[in-house]
């Protein structure tokens, strides 16, 4: 007999406006506890000191997490010029200083190298695995790591403000796997003055926006109540970047069993990824081929 999972079978998304000083895992655990949910996971880690959008998937919505982690994300952050730290943010020990301060024009010129397809070396204190161990664990032990550069798509990177000579506020829209701390570090090096992230906020992630997020304080206040459920968004929100194909009754039945099922296609092309719905409910995600959806993920709703 299968093991019974404890908790309520809730499926959907809860968008949390994560506060500084809390890990992404701690937020997920709080959401799971507050909703008494059987299953929960987040769609993209935020550093403990960062704030903003942390999209928490519940139940069957965890099957749509890859579509959010792969989506574009927007970050606003302040770079502190003139100082490098061990962690590339304000929490770390200062390891280098400079009296040089670039002009706005010099910063703008330097940003050009950080747009488009770039190669980025993760921070020493990051979750990247090195021979099975997390980089931050090795860095805490004093090791200096030679981390490999990784590709990153930067859609845009713009100056928002220049409060003073020591600071510049930036906004970046990027793809999966980007480290804002690396941008601040490398920008400082490119300008010859060092730099680190003073503060960081993720303003949106795929279809989810910070202004629609619920605070951790509100989660605590509404914990274990039906009122908290009203903040849970539909599972389909995580599929916003994929075309929706209505399934026929027979097609929906076949899809639920993991078999190709007939769908009503409009302008979806052969081989394109899409999701099927029936009577307003998501049924499956898969590849469209000749009038049928071939499922890769099936939702048990």
Swiss-Prot record:
It catalyses: uridine(55) in tRNA = pseudouridine(55) in tRNA. It comes from the Bacteria. It holds the Pfam family TruB_C_2. Its EC number is 5.4.99.25. One of its GO terms (molecular function) is RNA binding. Gene3D superfamilies: Pseudouridine synthase. Keywords: Isomerase, tRNA processing. The active site is at residue 47. Transmembrane segments: none annotated. One of its GO terms (biological process) is tRNA pseudouridine synthesis. Belongs to the pseudouridine synthase TruB family. Type 1 subfamily. Responsible for synthesis of pseudouridine from uracil-55 in the psi GC loop of transfer RNAs. This is tRNA pseudouridine synthase B. The gene is truB.
């Amino acid at each position: 007999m299968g093991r019974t999972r404890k908790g309520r079978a809730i499926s959907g998304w809860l968008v949390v406006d994560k506060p500084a000083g809390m890990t992404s895992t701690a937020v997920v655990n709080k959401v799971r506890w507050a909703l008494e949910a059987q299953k929960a996971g987040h769609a993209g880690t935020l550093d403990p000191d960062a704030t903003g959008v942390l999209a928490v998937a519940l139940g069957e919505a965890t099957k749509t997490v890859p579509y959010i982690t792969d989506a574009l994300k927007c970050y606003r952050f302040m770079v502190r010029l003139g100082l490098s730290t061990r962690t590339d943010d304000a929490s770390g020990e200062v390891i280098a200083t400079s009296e040089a301060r670039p002009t706005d024009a010099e910063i703008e010129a330097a940003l050009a190298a950080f747009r488009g397809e770039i190669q980025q070396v993760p921070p020493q204190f990051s979750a990247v695995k090195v021979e099975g161990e997390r980089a931050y664990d090795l860095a805490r032990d004093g090791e200096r790591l030679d981390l490999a550069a990784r590709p990153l798509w930067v859609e845009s990177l713009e100056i928002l403000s220049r409060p003073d000579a020591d600071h510049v506020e930036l906004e970046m829209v990027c793809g999966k796997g980007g480290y804002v701390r690396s941008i601040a570090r490398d920008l400082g090096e490119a300008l010859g003055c060092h730099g680190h992230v003073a503060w960081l906020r993720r303003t949106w992630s795929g279809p989810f926006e910070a202004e629609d997020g619920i605070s951790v304080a509100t989660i605590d206040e509404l914990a274990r109540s039906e009122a908290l459920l009203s903040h849970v968004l539909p599972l389909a929100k995580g599929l916003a970047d994929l075309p929706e194909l209505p399934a026929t009754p027979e097609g929906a039945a076949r899809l639920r069993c993991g078999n190709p099922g007939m769908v009503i296609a409009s302008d979806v092309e052969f081989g394109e990824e899409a999701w099927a719905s029936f009577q307003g409910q998501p049924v499956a995600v898969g590849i469209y081929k000749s009038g049928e959806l071939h499922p890769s993920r099936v939702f048990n709703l």
